[in-house]
Amino acid sequence: MATIGMGDIKKNIRLIIGEVPCKVIEFQHVKPGKGAAFVRMKAKSFLNGRVFEKTVHAGDKFEVPEITFKTMQYLYDDGEQYQFMDNDSYEQIGLSYEQCDDASKWFKDGIQVDMIFYKGNAISVSAPEVMELLITDTPPNFKGDTSSGSKKPATLETGAVVQVPYHVLEGDTIRVNTVDCEYLEKVK
């Protein structure tokens, strides 16, 4: 297995910390006035979605997990797990709510997602980076709202809530960045 050191750590890099495959979500290189440089990072476990902090010093090495991705179709929530179907073999795979974590707020029937496998087992899933979704609820506009440049909350068909400009109305379809949970544009 390949290894990475302190200088290779950056956002979205995958590594194994204490037998757990993780993804770095935040990092900061620190060079104190005295002593050696180090890296403070926040990593998210692929196994349970938990985020934890770790300090990495020069000389520390991490293995890179052998992770594979497969496109699968979201089917439904059975009350205990989310069910997905392999598009090639039609095999169904269930993932717990904990394994799906933040991606679950973007699930809608038939959506194609990337299933993440580690050592042959499905461990997590990620939604498409950009999606087109219908707004099911948002407050009405009042005179003068559009000139302020501020935003209002909008509930999407999946249940996710994003901040949108005032010109966007209930019933509109918008493009959303699912990674940052941000409005991108209104779909014509």
Curated annotation (Swiss-Prot):
Pathway: Protein biosynthesis; polypeptide chain elongation
One protein family per Pfam: EFP
GO cellular component, one term: cytoplasm
CDD domains tied to this protein: S1_EF-P_repeat_1, S1_EF-P_repeat_2
Keyword Phosphoprotein: no
Record-level GO BP terms: peptide biosynthetic process
Disulfide topology: none
Signal sequence annotation: none
Keywords of this entry: Cytoplasm, Elongation factor, Protein biosynthesis
Domain of life: Bacteria
Major location category of this protein: cytoplasm
Protein location: Cytoplasm
ATP-binding as UniProt keyword: no
GO molecular function terms noted in the UniProt entry: translation elongation factor activity
InterPro entries, per database record: Elong-fact-P_C (IPR015365), NA-bd_OB-fold (IPR012340), Rib_uL2_dom2 (IPR014722), Transl_elong_fac_P/YeiP (IPR020599), Transl_elong_KOW-like (IPR013185), Transl_elong_P/YeiP_cen (IPR001059), Transl_elong_P/YeiP_CS (IPR013852), Transl_elongation_fac_P (IPR011768)
Function, as annotated: Involved in peptide bond synthesis. Stimulates efficient translation and peptide-bond synthesis on native or reconstituted 70S ribosomes in vitro. Probably functions indirectly by altering the affinity of the ribosome for aminoacyl-tRNA, thus increasing their reactivity as acceptors for peptidyl transferase.
Family, per entry: Belongs to the elongation factor P family.
HAMAP family, alphabetized: EF_P (MF_00141)
Protein name: Elongation factor P
Lineage start: Bacteria, Pseudomonadati, Campylobacterota, Epsilonproteobacteria, Campylobacterales
